[in-house]
């Protein structure tokens, strides 16, 4: 088996995790108590969904996941919620005091006390796997726990499970909406770790997803539940090929191989189509070409950044539902002819496609309509550098005055770490710039190694 372990860190990670496991259970027909009435093979470990669930002798399915937070309130909602019987109590790990939006607390003082316990639980899950293929790590970089403990855990996972791939689903601060004043600090410090210790990081931001909910689903005031259910659809589409059998299956390591041209250039944009409410879906049937086009629309991107301002290096299209390869090829051919969608000239093909015959499932009573087919796109575009330059700018404004820095230093962090992390991000922005332009100069020689410092 090729198992995947999900790690949900901090409030954002845990709440996105809730939405994801709710959806996985619906997709596989697993009840909130972990039983699966439709399962013919009780206790047999080779069903496709066993990549995400382990099965006990009694036929109960337990998610291969851990939920971590430095304070109990958010995880308590899992402990008392609908799916409380699904998880083993040991999988829900909480501390007593929170990171207070402070990276240093999550990474040094408070995170340090809990991290060994977390790794211990993750080790138990890993020992339960026959062929662990990697980790999915869910967190945000704006708060303290997701950024600090998230970074610490990734560093430790790199040591303990060196070669296993780590995919991060990371909520980045939005341009306009902020939940904390010190977000830029936490983000820069945490991205420094994400650069080193994740293989692929998919960037999400709340503002972009708010806008999608408002525009496409007519939700006037979207809640976090609305946002998380949309994110869950994306993550479900990416992992569908691990959990179901399909025509063109995509492995976790395949994402890496196809999307990451240079080790540092691994921050992805994602989009999902069709995002459509039940009233509208009643009147329209969306073709493969239409959903593919809409996945490339700037408005569909789940992070606030305009792909028209950059070039694509690679792009992964994961279709699910009633889709045949012929339609996909036609849709991709059309995309390639569009002038607005530019690829760097050293990446001539640039597309990886996956098809899964399981149609998308929706949460009953949720916002999304049940559709026949859907597509999720993950793309590596130089435009993502916009996200970093925005955060860097805010970081610089605050750091020039050393505002709020004492909170970090007081928790045992050195001031040099700020400048080190900031320089690393400056180098990253430069890397993106070079990757987009390096192919025009010279005779293509430095194109081979120019962007990989």
UniProtKB/Swiss-Prot annotation:
Q: Where does Mg(2+) bind?
A: 71
* Catalysed reactions, semicolon-separated: GTP + H2O = GDP + phosphate + H(+)
Q: How is it modified after translation?
A: Acetylation of alpha chains at Lys-40 stabilizes microtubules and affects affinity and processivity of microtubule motors. This modification has a role in multiple cellular functions, ranging from cell motility, cell cycle progression or cell differentiation to intracellular trafficking and signaling.
Active site at 254
Location in or out of the cell: Cytoplasm, Cytoskeleton
Q: Which cofactor does it need?
A: Mg(2+)
Cellular component annotations (GO), alphabetically ordered = cytoplasm; microtubule
InterPro entries per the record?
Alpha_tubulin (IPR002452), Tub_FtsZ_C (IPR008280), Tubulin (IPR000217), Tubulin/FtsZ-like_C (IPR037103), Tubulin/FtsZ_2-layer-sand-dom (IPR018316), Tubulin/FtsZ_GTPase_sf (IPR036525), Tubulin_C (IPR023123), Tubulin_CS (IPR017975)
Q: Which Pfam families match?
A: Tubulin (PF00091), Tubulin_C (PF03953)
* Broadest EC class assigned to this enzyme: hydrolase
Q: Name one GO biological process term.
A: microtubule-based process
Q: List the disulfide bonds.
A: none
SMART domains cross-referenced by the UniProt entry: Tubulin (SM00864), Tubulin_C (SM00865)
Bias kind Acidic residues: ranges? 431-453
Residues bound to GTP are 11, 71, 140, 144-145, 179, 206, 228
* E.C. number: 3.6.5.-
Q: Domain of life of the organism in this record? A: Eukaryota
N6-acetyllysine found at: 40
A single MF term (Gene Ontology): GTP binding
Q: Which UniProt keywords apply?
A: Acetylation, Cytoplasm, Cytoskeleton, GTP-binding, Hydrolase, Magnesium, Metal-binding, Microtubule, Nucleotide-binding
Q: Segment Disordered: which positions?
A: 429-453
Assembly mode: Dimer of alpha and beta chains. A typical microtubule is a hollow water-filled tube with an outer diameter of 25 nm and an inner diameter of 15 nM. Alpha-beta heterodimers associate head-to-tail to form protofilaments running lengthwise along the microtubule wall with the beta-tubulin subunit facing the microtubule plus end conferring a structural polarity. Microtubules usually have 13 protofilaments but different protofilament numbers can be found in some organisms and specialized cells.
Q: What does this protein do?
A: Tubulin is the major constituent of microtubules, a cylinder consisting of laterally associated linear protofilaments composed of alpha- and beta-tubulin heterodimers. Microtubules grow by the addition of GTP-tubulin dimers to the microtubule end, where a stabilizing cap forms. Below the cap, tubulin dimers are in GDP-bound state, owing to GTPase activity of alpha-tubulin.
Task: Give the UniProt family note.
Answer: Belongs to the tubulin family.
Name of the molecule in the record: Tubulin alpha-13 chain
User: Gene encoding this chain?
Assistant: TUBA13
């Amino acid at each position: 088996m090729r198992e995947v372990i999900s790690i949900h860190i901090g409030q954002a990670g845990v709440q996105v995790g809730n939405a994801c496991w709710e959806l996985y259970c619906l997709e596989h027909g697993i009840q909130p108590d972990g039983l699966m009435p439709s399962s013919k093979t009780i206790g047999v470990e080779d069903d496709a969904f066993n990549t995400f669930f382990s099965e006990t002798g009694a036929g109960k399915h337990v998610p291969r996941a851990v939920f971590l937070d430095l304070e109990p309130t958010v995880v308590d909602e899992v402990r008392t919620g609908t799916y409380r019987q699904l998880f083993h109590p040991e999988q829900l790990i909480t501390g007593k005091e929170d990171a207070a939006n402070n990276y240093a607390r999550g990474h040094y003082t408070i995170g340090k006390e809990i991290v060994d316990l977390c790794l211990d639980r993750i080790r138990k899950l890993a020992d339960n796997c026959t062929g662990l293929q990697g980790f999915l790590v869910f967190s945000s970089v704006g708060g303290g726990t997701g950024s600090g403990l998230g970074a610490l855990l990734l560093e430790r996972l790199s040591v303990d499970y060196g070669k296993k791939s780590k995919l991060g689903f990371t909520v980045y601060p939005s341009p306009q909406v902020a939940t904390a004043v010190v977000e830029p600090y936490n983000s820069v410090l945490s991205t420094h770790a994400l650069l080193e210790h994740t293989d692929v990081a998919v960037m999400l931001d709340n503002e972009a997803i708010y806008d999608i909910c408002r525009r496409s689903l007519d939700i006037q005031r979207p809640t976090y539940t609305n946002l998380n259910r949309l994110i869950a659809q994306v993550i479900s589409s990416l992992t569908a090929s691990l959990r179901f059998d399909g025509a063109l299956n995509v492995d976790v390591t395949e994402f890496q191989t196809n999307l990451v041209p240079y080790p540092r250039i691994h921050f992805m944009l994602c989009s999902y189509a069709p995002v459509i409410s039940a009233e509208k879906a009643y009147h329209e049937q969306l073709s493969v070409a239409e959903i593919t086009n809409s996945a490339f629309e700037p408005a569909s991107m789940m992070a606030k950044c305009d792909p028209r301002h950059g070039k694509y290096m690679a792009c992964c299209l994961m279709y699910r539902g009633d889709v045949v390869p012929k339609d996909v090829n036609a849709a991709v051919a059309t995309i390639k002819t569009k002038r607005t969608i530019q690829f760097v000239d050293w990446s001539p093909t640039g597309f990886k496609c996956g098809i899964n015959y399981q149609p998308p499932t929706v949460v009953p009573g949720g916002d999304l309509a049940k559709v026949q087919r859907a597509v999720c796109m993950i793309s590596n575009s130089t435009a993502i550098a916009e996200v970093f330059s925005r955060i860097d700018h805010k970081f610089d404004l605050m750091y020039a005055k050393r505002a709020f820095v004492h909170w970090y230093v007081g928790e045992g962090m050195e001031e040099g770490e700020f400048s080190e992390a900031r320089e690393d991000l400056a180098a990253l922005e430069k890397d993106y710039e070079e990757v987009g332009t390096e192919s025009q100069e010279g005779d293509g020689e430095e194109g081979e190694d120019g962007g990989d410092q």
